[in-house]
Design a protein with these regions (language model features):
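Extended alpha-helical targeting/anchoring segments
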Residues: 1-501
Length: 501
């Protein structure tokens, strides 16, 4: 088993700074979910890839008990610590505040460790765009922060190939006895989360019998879908689509992506919902983020931005068909999607938007399309997917990269700013986290963020999610309503399943 020895720590610590110390443990009798179950009630995160489309992800990242929480609300940014409580920071937007926090630390990255070695893990809600673009004024969701991040100096890293877990603790090398203190914290974390005799709390909430989630997905009773109630009827959504099409004909936009909200009451716990969703809808970005009274449970297929070294990337997804009930039906739908002129035109537009987003922060001439318009199959739908990459400019960092791409054009339309202005007029309720970003800024400089789609938000017993459809000039209004339902089916199924766990 690997560990950072005292001698190796001494070499890394010669110049001072924050040094990650680690020890590897056998984890063949544990899973990230079983360990997460022992953190129930605590602020916590679990980030992993469980998608069969990319052979799954090697690493799962888990953390609890952050040393601070940074969040933005009502035009101010706050930092809260267990010792000091909350204080207002001078920065006016959350990305500037996070950059300042990171600059206070001189981090000695370990090239032998996975990219997340401590940092900020959380989300930017769609409404955070107000801090970046004054022209856009989305109505915020009541009580929902514009952004919330857990600041952590300890991470559990599951290596899903080796069936081991690294416990990583970041320590100020200038503290007396720093190495011993780091090892003490590592042993304490291992004892807390990996002792087989520790009781595990039940996954199901104490509320008892299942609430309203007993209808099969797509059931017609009461206009619900698997217990979720949509906020718009097909006719109401179609009316919004017609308004968007009129704006497009008038030259206001090329595409607009109106969404709708689905809500239900549930007896399932956040952990049960997470377990169900990762089985029902395994995705490249499965995440669990509990910050305060609110938990995000997501299975997003779409990368917003990623930075590894100086290479940055984005992964536009646009164009959708149902998965198909049989292999023959799936193959026919795949051919239909690949040959659909409307879907391909929409995809080209959004790939160009992704290239422009990267072009604002990349070295001139380095942005390229690595893979274009391949069909990828997910659990309930298939999409057209492309990969765009570039080399980050020397004077830019991960905070600049996220700012340049936020929010994703695939969730707003194009041009972005005008599309967002129109969405503020047409959508029936605030977007909240939908269309925002969830992921991490590592102390190493690496970042990895998914677009917040296929994501449920649990607060108390209230469970909600949103889905949208990309509207262009020749969109069929009722078909687009069906697309919002198709994109939500994994959540409908997972919520029903979770109430049996």
């Amino acid at each position: 088993m690997k560990e950072l020895t005292r001698e190796a720590f001494g070499r890394r610590a010669r110049g001072g700074g924050i040094v990650p110390v680690y020890r590897e443990f056998l984890a063949d009798m544990e899973t990230p979910v079983s360990v997460l179950s022992r953190a129930e009630g605590e602020d916590a995160f679990l980030l992993e890839s469980v998608a069969s489309t990319d052979n799954g992800g090697r690493y799962s990242f888990l953390g609890v008990n952050p040393y601070a929480t940074l969040y933005a609300q009502d035009g101010r940014v706050f930092l809260r610590t267990p010792a000091e409580g909350g204080r207002v920071l001078p920065e006016k937007d959350v990305l500037a505040a996070l950059r300042s926090v990171f600059r206070e630390k001189r981090f000695v990255a370990d090239p032998d460790l996975p990219p997340l070695q401590g940092g900020a893990i959380g989300y930017l809600a769609y409404d955070a765009v107000r801090a970046f673009e004054p022209r856009v004024k989305p109505v915020p969701e009541e009580g929902m922060p514009d952004a919330a991040f857990l600041l952590t100096d300890s991470v559990l890293v599951f290596d899903n190939r080796r069936r081991t877990a690294l416990v990583v603790v970041c320590i100020n090398a200038e503290l007396p006895g720093a190495y011993d203190e780091a090892m003490r914290r590592i042993d304490a974390l291992h004892a807390k989360f990996f002792r087989s005799d520790r009781p595990r709390p039940p996954a199901r909430a104490a509320a008892g019998a299942a609430a309203s989630g007993n209808a099969a997905p797509g059931a017609s009773g009461g206009g619900t879908f698997g217990g979720f109630t949509p906020e718009m009827t097909p006719a109401e959504y179609a009316a919004v689509v017609e308004k968007c099409k009129e704006d497009i004909r008038n030259g206001e936009c090329i595409q607009i992506v109106p969404s709708q909200k689905f809500t239900m009451e549930t007896s399932a716990s956040a952990l049960a919902l997470s377990r169900a969703l990762r089985v029902v809808n395994p995705s490249p970005y499965n995440f669990f983020l509990k910050i305060g009274a609110r938990t995000l449970i997501g299975s997003s297929p779409e990368e917003l931005v990623k930075l590894s070294g100086r290479t940055c990337s984005t992964c536009p997804i646009a164009g959708t068909r149902p998965r198909g009930a049989t292999p023959e039906a799936a193959a026919a739908l795949e051919r239909e999607l690949a040959g659909d002129e409307k879907e391909n035109a929409e995809h080209v537009m959004l790939v160009d938007l992704g290239r422009n987003d990267l072009g604002r922060v990349c070295e001139t001439g380095t942005v390229k399309v690595d893979s274009f318009a391949r069909v990828e199959r997910f659990s309930h739908v298939m999409h057209l997917v492309s990969d765009v990459s570039g080399t980050l400019a020397a004077d830019k960092d991960g905070f600049d990269l996220l700012r340049s791409a936020f929010p994703a054009g695939t969730l707003t339309g194009a041009p972005k700013i005008r599309a967002m202005e129109l969405l503020a007029k047409y959508e029936k309720s605030p977007r909240g986290v939908y269309g925002g970003a969830a992921g991490y800024f590592s102390f190493t400089g690496a970042i990895d963020f998914a677009i917040v789609i296929r994501t449920m938000v649990l607060e108390g017993r209230r469970l909600s999610m949103r889905a949208g459809a990309g509207i262009v000039a020749d969109s069929d209004p009722f078909r687009e309503y069906g697309e919002t339902v198709n994109k939500s089916k994994a959540a409908f199924e997972a919520a029903k399943f979770a109430e049996t766990l």
